[in-house]
Structure formats: C-alpha cells, structure tokens
C-alpha cells in the first residue's frame, strides 16, 4: 500500500481530497488518525500499491518542459509537454498517479491521469500548438498520442516527481 508522509498544513479532508478517497476510508486504514495529524507522520492510503514496487517513475522538468519516463532507473522516453503559466504554476514535489480517465472531454484531450494533488493531472490537449509552452492552469499537457502511450504503460501508484 502507498504510504504518505503528512505535510505541514495537511488535514484529513485535504489528504482525502488529494487522493480521491473518503475520510472514512482513511480513518479505517489508519485508526490512529482519530487523535489527529502530525507533520511527518506516515499514513496508509488504501487502494493504491506501494509505489516503490512499481518499476516506473515519471520526472517532469518545468523549465525544460519535458516529461521523462524511466523503467528501473533507466530512461525509456522523454516527451515534450506544456506546463502552468506564471499565475497558475505547475506544483513541484512528489505525487502519484491515482486514477485515470480516457476521453475526459473538454480541453483535456484523449486521456487524463489524476495526480495526488486535487485538480492537477497529466493529460492530452485539444490545442497541440500549446505543447512546449507555459500556458496551462498548472496541469501537465501532452500530445494526445503521447499521453495515450504513457497511460498504456504506467499503472496507478506510479511516482511523479515535478521539479523546476
């Protein structure tokens, strides 16, 4: 199971929202949470595998506007991406793919991979000319063919590291 380290400012509700699970499910998996959260505390996120058992890793470089997929610490492929604009920057840190949806509609293109930060994901686009630019509302945009390929390879629980 995925273990999450509580950060300063996290609440039970914010963690549940980020991982798209109920607070009841979090409490059931972590009875000690009845006493409250403490920064640095490790909690189990039910329904997701231990990400360190998954051989894939995604590294996003905001500055280079690239997404690099690795298998067992060896680069498989690097994709061009679009990232958040100045007022809606792409968040940095370590996240996990927690769910996915094919053909989500609207500007999200052919696929949506939800990250463990509410409202953020890796997705396709209905505007391929935007790839390589800082134009999104914080999400990571890919060409549709690329996000379909990525989604066919990586399972839920895959670690996604985003750096400036």
UniProtKB/Swiss-Prot annotation:
The keyword Glycosyltransferase applies. GO terms for biological process: cell wall organization; peptidoglycan-protein cross-linking; regulation of cell shape; sporulation resulting in formation of a cellular spore. Residues 2-45 form the LysM domain. It is found in: Spore wall. InterPro entries: LD-transpeptidase, LD_TPept_cat_dom, LysM_dom, LysM_dom_sf, Transpep_catalytic_dom. Disulfide bonds: none annotated. Coiled coil: none annotated. Its main location: other. Pathway: Cell wall biogenesis; peptidoglycan biosynthesis. The active site is at residues 123, 139. CDD domains: LysM (cd00118), YkuD_like (cd16913). Its EC number is 2.-.-.-. GO terms for cellular component: spore wall. SUPFAM superfamilies: L,D-transpeptidase catalytic domain-like, LysM domain. PROSITE patterns: LD_TPASE (PS52029), LYSM (PS51782). Residues 56-163 form the L,D-TPase catalytic domain. GO terms for molecular function: glycosyltransferase activity; peptidoglycan L,D-transpeptidase activity. Belongs to the YkuD family. Probable enzyme that may play an important role in cell wall biology. LysM domains are thought to be involved in peptidoglycan binding. Monomer. Regulated by SigK. Could also be negatively regulated by GerE. Transcribed by SigK RNA polymerase. This is Putative L,D-transpeptidase YkuD.
